[in-house]
Amino acid sequence: HSIRRRQRQMCIRDSFVPHDKLSREQHEQHVAQLIDAYMPDTIVLARYMRVLTNDFVDRYSGRLINIHHSFLPAFVGAAPYRQAFERGVKVIGATAHYVTAELDAGPIIAQDVIPVDHSFTAKQMAQAGRNVEKSVLAKAVRLVLEDRIFVHSGRTVVFS
């Protein structure tokens, strides 16, 4: 993957904590130990696909960014592309947001959509959506790292 290659070139570390044979709390404890060792300002959950406990979310409040593969608030939770395909939507999108205790409901940092139509298969729709996810996540991370996001009353203000 080109992301892995760029990551190595930039000396960005990553870690893998398998979750099989661990309770959710045990898994999060291992992840928290790794996070705390690095003390990051921002934590990106890309393809994490696990619901976090409230304790974990509270511990890293304001630092967790998630990319969700739908144009929120539509199609919260798992399998949004399947849901979108079944509903016959005319646009699909992605949303980068801060993580809160409520699933996929945190303050929105960035969003984008692309048009789709009846000729798209479910697989084509998902592939097109993944491309949107990449660009939305990159934009959101850039905005956060450039300190251009202000959160107020559960909403974000993006400074240009």
Stretches with model-predicted labels:
Residues 13-40:
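Adenosine-nucleotide cofactor-binding segment
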Residues 7, 37-39, 59:
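Alpha-helix C-terminal capping/helix-to-coil transition sites in glycosyltransferase folds
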Residues 23, 27, 42-160:
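Donor/substrate-binding cores of folate-linked one-carbon enzymes
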Residues 1-8, 12:
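Single conserved hydrophobic/aromatic residue that forms the stacking wall/gate
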